[in-house]
Amino acid sequence: MSAQKERGPTAPVERLLLVLGDQLNADASALAEADRARDVLWMAEVQEESRHVWSSRPRTALFLAAMRHFRDARRAEGWRVEYVALDDPGNSQTLAGELRRAVERLRPRRLVMTAAGDHRVAQALSSAAAGLGVPLEVREDRHFLCSTAEFTAHAAGRKQLRLEFFYRELRRRHRILLDDAGEPLGGQWNFDHDNRGSFGREGPPADLPAPRHFAPDAVTREVLRLVAERFPEHPGDLAAFDWPVTPVDARLALDDFIAHRLPQFGRYQDAIWLGEPWLYHSRLAAAMNLKLLNPREVIAAAEAAHRDGRVDLPSAEGFIRQILGWREYVRGIYWREMPGYLERNELGAEESLPKFYWTGETEMACLRDALGQTLRLGYAHHIQRLMVTGLYALLLGVRPRSVHEWYLAVYVDAVEWVEAPNTIGMSQYADGGLMASKPYVATGKYIQRMSNACAGCRFRPDESTGVSACPFTTLYWDFLQRHEPLLKRNQRMALQVKNLARLSPAQRTAVRQR
C-alpha cells in the first residue's frame, strides 16, 4: 500500500524513521526505542536507485521485493509505515525528493536513520534534511561486528592495512573458532592454502546439491511485473528470480547451505565450471547485505557445524573469514577512504569498458560464461568476479570508475560499501595497494587450472602471440611491460616481473601489437 493510500487524520509525528533498501532488519538502530504511537517509518522506491548506475532487473527486483515484505511485516506489528511505491502518482523518483515531500506533509520534529551503506545516499539525505531545517540523527549500524570507530582505531598508526591482522583481531574479540586458551582451532588462523582445489577434468559430481530456491509470492510477483514494465531495457532475467526476500526465507537458505554445500565449500571455493553458477557457494551475500540475515547468526551456524563434526575446519574457517574478515574489512576501508576512493586510479587506466560486458558476446569462453550468468542472474562467485571479469578489465587497463559502476549495477548483492573496495582496491589495484598487497594478475593458465573453460575455447592459454593467443595471456605480458617500473618496487611481484626477461625484444613488440 502506498503512502497516498495511508493519508488521513493521524497523531502528530514526533520522529520520522528512515529505512533504506539495504536496512531491512527489524532490530535496526533507527527503530530502537521508537514510540509506535508517535513515530513513523518512512520508505521509498525511486527510479534514481536503479538508474544512477544501469541496475540489473534482478537487483532492482530483489531490493523492492524485500522492502515490501519488510513494510508488510512492520505494519502487522502495529507500525505506521509511510511507503512510496515506484508507480505512485507524484513520486519524484529520488530519495531526497521523497523525503522532502514526506517532511512537508507529516511535519516530524526530527529524523532518525541508521547510517547508510552508500556515501552518495548519505550525502543526499543529509543535504535534504538540512535544507528542510529538520534535525537528522544518524545512528551506528549495529548489523556489523566492527564499528567504523573501531576500524579507525585499528588502522591508526599502521603503515599498511592488511586483512589478516584485522581478521585475527576480530576472531579474538568475538571468540570465534578459538580453543579454551584463546588460540585458533587447528593451530593456525588461516587455511587458505587448503582451499584452492579445482574439479579437474571430471568436473563437479553428478549429485552436486542445488541451492534451495524460493518461488516468488504475490508481493514479489507484483514487483517483478513492475520492474519489467519500468526497466525494460535493463539487463537480467526476471523469470529466473528465486532469491530469498524475507528473514525467514534467508534463514532457510542459510540452513540449506550449512547442511548441503558448506562441507565442500572450502576445497572448491575458487573453482569454476561452465554452466554451473552456484557450485558450493552460499548465495547468502545478498540476504546479508540487505540485512535479512545477521552475520553473527551466519558465523555461529558455520562454527557450530564444525564443532559438531559436520564440516571440516578449512571449510568453516574459509567461509567465516569471508564474513568476519573480508566483509567487515572492506566496509572499514570504504568509510575511511570515501569520498575520494571512487576516483583512485593508481595505474592510470583510461580504456573504456568493452561493450561485451553488457552483452556477454565474446569468443573468450570463460568471459562469455561469467558475463552470461551475471547478466542473466545478477550473480557470479568471487573468483569469477576477481579472476575473470575483473582480471580482464585490469589487464586491459579499463578506467576503474567504469569497472566499479558495472559491478555495482549488475550484481544483486551489490551495495557500494562492499562492492567499491572489492572492485577499486582488490580487483583493479587502483588504490595502489591499500586493499591488496599486489595486483592480482595471471595469464590464461590460471583460468585453465581452475576451470574447464579453456577446453572448448578457440584461444590457447599458453600462447601470448598469434591468432590463437589467449587475450588474458597476451594482456598479462603487456600489463607487466606497461607497469614494469612500478611493479619492480613491489617485492610480491618480483618473480613475475623477472619473468619479463624471458621475452625477447621481438616478443615484447609482438605482445604490444597483439
Protein language model regions, located:
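Hydrophobic/aromatic-rich, well-ordered segments within soluble, folded domains that form packed cores
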Residues: L62-E82, V112-M113, L377-R401
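Gly/Ser/Thr-rich loops at beta-strand to alpha-helix junctions
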Residues: Q23-N25, G90, A115-Q123, L394
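N-terminal beta-strand-loop-alpha-helix module at the start
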Residues: S2-L86
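Substrate/cofactor-recognition hotspot
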Residues: E14-A30, R57, L185-D312, R482-R514
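Beta-rich, aromatic/charged-enriched effector core domains that present basic-aromatic interfaces
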Residues: T94-W243, I424
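C-terminal catalytic domain of photolyase/cryptochrome flavoproteins
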Residues: G8, L20, L252, A271, ...
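A short acidic (Asp/Glu
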Residues: D27-L31, V53-S55, Q93-A96, V121-S126, ...
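Short His-Asn-centered micro-motif
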Residues: L18-G21, A44-E45, V84-L86, M113-A116, ...
